[in-house]
Every structure is written in structure tokens, then in C-alpha cells.
A protein has these predicted regions:
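C-terminal region of N-terminal signal peptides and the immediate post-cleavage residues
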Residues: 17-30
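Bacterial N-terminal signal peptides
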Residues: 9-17
């Protein structure tokens, strides 16, 4: 009786392990899962940050700062959604680093927004340079994924 129970338990365990292996996320599957999330964020940023460069040039720093803060909130939401997507185990280290850069981008957008609202244009410009550098580092992590919308390009808006 104990042998039969042990065999059934082992068989069930092997079946579960096989299902887990079959359900392992692939790089292609990951890209398919995250691109719509990034697309939504990109489209939101196009609306939110569309005229921000002109606002800053015209000295309208408070509205530009408000736009940066909205973009920060959108990116933080996107970052949380991206973190919830199962990752391919072979790419977990790269994706973990990429997600940390994405999270940092949200913080930098927020810092730049606060600086603009406070009338600190030079400080905001310095933060935007840091933001662009951070985005480049993030993109380097996932170059092999051939992302379209998940390639972060803050320079399009700033």
C-alpha cells in the first residue's frame, strides 16, 4: 500500500514538473505579453508629454512639470504591470535589471516634474540628461528582445 501511494505521489509530482516546464515562458512569449503594456504607456506619454518641450522653451515650467508628474505616474503603473509578467528563467537577470531601470525612470520623471514645478529649469535639464542615460542603459539590457514599444526613448518628448 505504501509503495502504491509513493508511486502515485511521484507520478503526480513528475506530471506537475512536466506541466511547469511546458508552461515555461519563452522570450517570444514574454515580448508578446509586455509589448501591449508598453504600447499603452507610449501612447499615453505621447498625449501627456506632446508639447512639453515647447512649454519649457516658453518658460511655462509649472504645466510642463505637471505633465512630467503625470508621465511618472503612468510609468510607475507600467512598471508594476511589467513586473507582474512571468519572465523566461534564462533571461531573469537581464529582465530584472531592465525592470529596475524602468522603475528608476519613473522616479526620474517625478524628480524632473517637481523641479519644473518649482521653477528649477537647470535642475530639471540635468535630471532629463540622467533620465536619457538611464533609458539607454535599460534599452541595452533588452536589445536582444527586439522590442518596439518597450524601447524607452524619453528624448522624443524632452
Amino acid at each position: 500500500m505504501k509503495t502504491k501511494t509513493l508511486i502515485l505521489t511521484l507520478t503526480a509530482f513528475i506530471a506537475l514538473v512536466s506541466l511547469a516546464a511546458a508552461a515555461e515562458q519563452t522570450r517570444e512569449g514574454y515580448v508578446e505579453a509586455v509589448e501591449p503594456i508598453c504600447k499603452t504607456n507610449t501612447e499615453a506619454n505621447e498625449k501627456i508629454l506632446g508639447g512639453v518641450r515647447q512649454e519649457v522653451k516658453a518658460g511655462k515650467l509649472k504645466p510642463a512639470g505637471a505633465a512630467f508628474l503625470k508621465a511618472a505616474a503612468a510609468l510607475k503603473k507600467t512598471s508594476a504591470q511589467l513586473a507582474a509578467v512571468p519572465q523566461p528563467s534564462a533571461d531573469a537577470a537581464k529582465l530584472g535589471k531592465w525592470l529596475s531601470y524602468v522603475k528608476e525612470e519613473g522616479k526620474l520623471f517625478e524628480k524632473a516634474g517637481k523641479a519644473l514645478k518649482a521653477g528649477q529649469k537647470t535642475k530639471a535639464q540635468t535630471i532629463v540628461v540622467e533620465l536619457t542615460h538611464n533609458a539607454n542603459l535599460a534599452n541595452e539590457q533588452v536589445f536582444a528582445f527586439d522590442f518596439h514599444y518597450c524601447q524607452f526613448e524619453p528624448s522624443k518628448f524632452t
